[in-house]
Amino acid sequence: SQATTLPASFAEDAAAYPAAGCKAAEVWLTKLEKHLQEVTAEDTRKALADAGLALVAAAYQGGLLLSQGEQRKAHFDHFKRRLDLCQQFGIPTLVVVADFAQSPDAAALGRAVVSLAQAAQWAAGFGVRLALEFRGTDAFCSNLDTALTLVEQCGEPNAGVCLDAFH
């Protein structure tokens, strides 16, 4: 995962990972977005293919589950641009983080389930699966059980859970 090499650029990672024997990587989307400000998508895809490096997952998108109003619109617009990147680069899975800074009430939980379902529906249109990542430091969705419950309740076949061994 490029999360482990944040100080390096996307191009540096794209060269170093295969040199270290890695044939696949989880791309840090902010790195890819920054890289694409200077290098075309076509040239980037060619460089990845030449290096023998496949982008198998993308990290990560937040702000989708609980945001409302203009914030929700901004997060979903950003999400759709990232889905387009996933489609362009053949990245099959996008990691979504549960943005539960505070303990949610029943209305917020309902909104989170609906938002996850809507996000999964958008992702399906781009041929992308979503992987909901839970974190022990979150106020909610801090373990496998709550992540599985949210995914199950959203009812979308392309929504699943990310088991992140990094933290």
Name these PLM-found stretches.
Residues 1-91, 124, 156-160:
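N-terminal pre-domain/capping segments
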Residues 24-25, 55-58, 117-167:
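Acidic/histidine-rich catalytic cores of soluble enzymes
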Residues 78, 112-115:
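Hydrophobic alpha-helical membrane-association signature
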Residues 86-106, 126-136:
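Active-site groove signature of glycoside hydrolases
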Residues 4, 29-33, 61-64, 98-102, ...:
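Active-site-proximal loop/turn and secondary-structure-junction residues that shape catalytic pockets
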Residues 1-4, 103-111, 161:
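Short N-terminal helix-initiation segments at or just after the protein's N-terminus
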Residues 10-14, 37-41, 106-113, 138-156:
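Distinct, well-ordered alpha-helical segments
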